[in-house]
Structure formats: structure tokens, C-alpha cells
């Protein structure tokens, strides 16, 4: 049985209200209308059209080959299946290399149904965040492990371990909020650090491999369903379809587990 009762469309003010009320936010990825309908009807608050499609849909080894054209196409598909969830969309690799370039890409995505734009990283990306927010475009700031930086990181590794690295990530989160970010997404971050950032931040945090202390959780849909992407399965992934049932049932089980705090548990969490 689902504990999901909200049928109102999700908005930026609704995110802020969830943070104030301590209501957990449920997020999943989708890349087409069919799966988007299932997510939308089974307790998912935010749907992410992630550039992860480069790996789980297109078969690449990273997200780097994904283009703005790809993101526009898949965003348009997903938008046709959504009635209640908020649609968050990635700017792909180098689409945010300058504020002007980011605005052009974001505008194309908003025109086909995006409601919030996700940008990876901090540093010079803060200028991009401010530039978009000043032009009335909601932004999610993705911090911690940012897959578009995989070449610099030397692989997919936990970020923020140790006092210096943790302090740097907390500073990046504060700067992103000051730049106008409406939402923070924390990936592969020690749970203690993610909880500190969540307490500090005036906006909601969504975790993926960042522990239960975040204001919400996200997973890649293919991971949640146990589909083989040809890549090693991260520690934070749980197969909600492992014991049978339907896709809709797996999505409901995930949504309920996020809301009641049973996912992620220690098994699916990184520590310092």
C-alpha cells in the first residue's frame, strides 16, 4: 500500500514547504513518456531527465557524449507523460561552459517541458547559476561526485571525505544557495557530511549515495529495477524489483521507503 497522498502538481514553493515540514522528497530518473507515466502515478515527486541516459540508454561509458539535442528530445518525451511531478533536467557536458551558452540550452529545455535545470559543479558554475536565476529559471546545483568531471576525478569516487574536502564541499553548497539554487543534489558524499549540509542549507537537499539525512532521495530508474547497464553497480543502489512484482510496484516500494526513512539504510550509505 502506498503512503503517497499528494495529487497536486509539484512546484518550487512546494519544495520549500516540504523542507519546512520535514516531508521527504522522492525523485527518480525517466527518459521516455511510458516510464514517466508510471513514476508520475506512483508517488514520485520529482522526475529527473538525467544525462545518465548516455550510459543507461545510449550505451556510452560516461555521460560526456550526451548533447543538448539528446536532452531536448528525451525531455519532450518525458513531459508528455507527466501531470503532477516536477520535471528537472540536466544541462549536458559543456552546455554550461558560459552563462550565455547555458541560457540558450536551458531555454530550449524549458520550451519542451523542463521546470528546473540541473547544473553540475561549483566554482565558475556559480556565475551560471546566478545568470539563470536572474532570468527566472529555477536551478538545481549538483555537488559531490559530478559525473561530467569523471576525467578529473579519475573515476567515480566518493567525494568530501576528510576535514579539508568536507569543508570545501560545505562551502560549495553555501555558495550555490547564495547564487540562487533552489535545490541541492548531493552524490556519493559521506552521510555525516550530507546531513550537515542539509541542516545548514535553506533549500532542500536530494541525496544519491549521501545517506538518509538528506531531504529527499534520487536513483536512476534502471538501477532501481535491477537492469544491467554494463557498468559496476554502486553501493547506494538497491534493486526494488528483485523479489518480483511490477515496475509500478517497485516504484511505490521505493517511494514508501524514502518517505518512511527505511531507504537508504547503512548498507547503501557511505561513511567518512
Curated annotation (Swiss-Prot):
EC number: 2.1.2.11
Annotated function: Catalyzes the reversible reaction in which hydroxymethyl group from 5,10-methylenetetrahydrofolate is transferred onto alpha-ketoisovalerate to form ketopantoate.
Domain of life of the organism encoding this protein: Bacteria
GO BP term (any one): pantothenate biosynthetic process
Catalysed conversion reaction: 3-methyl-2-oxobutanoate + (6R)-5,10-methylene-5,6,7,8-tetrahydrofolate + H2O = 2-dehydropantoate + (6S)-5,6,7,8-tetrahydrofolate
InterPro entries (alphabetical): Pantoate_hydroxy_MeTrfase, Pyrv/PenolPyrv_kinase-like_dom, Pyrv_kinase-like_dom_sf
Source lineage: Bacteria, Pseudomonadati, Pseudomonadota, Gammaproteobacteria, Lysobacterales
Identification of the protein by name: 3-methyl-2-oxobutanoate hydroxymethyltransferase
Pathway(s) served: Cofactor biosynthesis; (R)-pantothenate biosynthesis; (R)-pantoate from 3-methyl-2-oxobutanoate: step 1/2
Organism in which the protein naturally occurs: Xylella fastidiosa (strain Temecula1 / ATCC 700964)
Keyword line: Cytoplasm, Magnesium, Metal-binding, Pantothenate biosynthesis, Transferase
Residues holding Mg(2+): 51, 90, 120
Annotated active site: 187
CDD domains assigned to the protein according to its UniProt record, in alphabetical order: KPHMT-like
Leading EC class: transferase
Cofactor remark from the record: Binds 1 Mg(2+) ion per subunit.
Subunit field text: Homodecamer; pentamer of dimers.
Record's subcellular location: Cytoplasm
Amino acid at each position: 500500500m502506498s503512503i503517497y497522498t499528494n495529487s497536486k502538481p509539484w512546484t518550487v514553493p512546494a519544495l520549500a514547504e516540504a523542507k519546512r515540514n520535514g516531508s521527504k522528497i522522492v525523485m527518480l530518473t525517466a527518459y521516455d513518456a511510458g516510464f514517466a507515466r508510471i513514476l508520475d502515478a506512483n508517488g514520485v515527486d520529482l522526475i529527473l531527465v538525467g544525462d545518465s541516459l548516455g550510459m543507461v540508454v545510449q550505451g556510452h561509458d560516461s555521460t560526456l557524449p550526451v548533447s543538448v539535442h539528446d536532452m531536448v528530445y528525451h525531455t519532450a518525451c518525458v513531459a508528455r507523460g507527466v501531470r503532477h511531478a516536477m520535471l528537472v533536467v540536466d544541462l549536458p557536458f559543456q552546455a554550461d561552459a558560459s552563462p550565455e551558452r547555458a541560457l540558450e540550452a536551458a531555454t530550449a529545455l524549458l520550451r519542451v517541458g523542463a521546470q528546473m535545470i540541473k547544473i553540475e559543479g561549483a566554482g565558475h558554475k556559480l556565475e551560471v547559476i546566478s545568470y539563470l536565476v536572474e532570468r527566472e529559471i529555477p536551478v538545481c546545483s549538483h555537488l559531490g561526485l559530478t559525473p561530467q568531471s569523471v576525467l578529473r576525478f579519475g573515476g567515480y569516487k566518493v567525494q568530501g571525505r576528510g576535514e579539508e574536502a568536507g569543508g570545501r564541499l560545505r562551502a560549495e553548497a553555501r555558495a550555490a544557495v547564495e547564487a540562487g539554487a533552489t535545490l541541492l543534489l548531493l552524490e556519493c558524499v559521506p552521510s555525516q557530511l550530507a546531513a550537515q549540509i542539509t541542516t545548514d542549507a535553506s533549500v532542500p537537499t536530494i541525496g544519491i549515495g549521501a545517506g538518509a539525512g538528506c531531504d529527499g532521495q534520487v536513483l536512476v530508474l534502471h538501477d532501481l529495477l535491477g537492469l544491467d547497464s554494463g557498468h559496476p553497480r554502486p553501493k547506494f543502489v538497491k534493486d526494488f524489483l528483485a523479489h518480483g512484482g511490477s515496475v509500478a510496484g517497485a516504484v511505490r516500494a521505493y517511494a514508501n521507503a524514502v518517505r518512511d526513512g527505511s531507504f537508504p539504510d547503512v548498507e547503501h550509505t557511505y561513511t567518512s
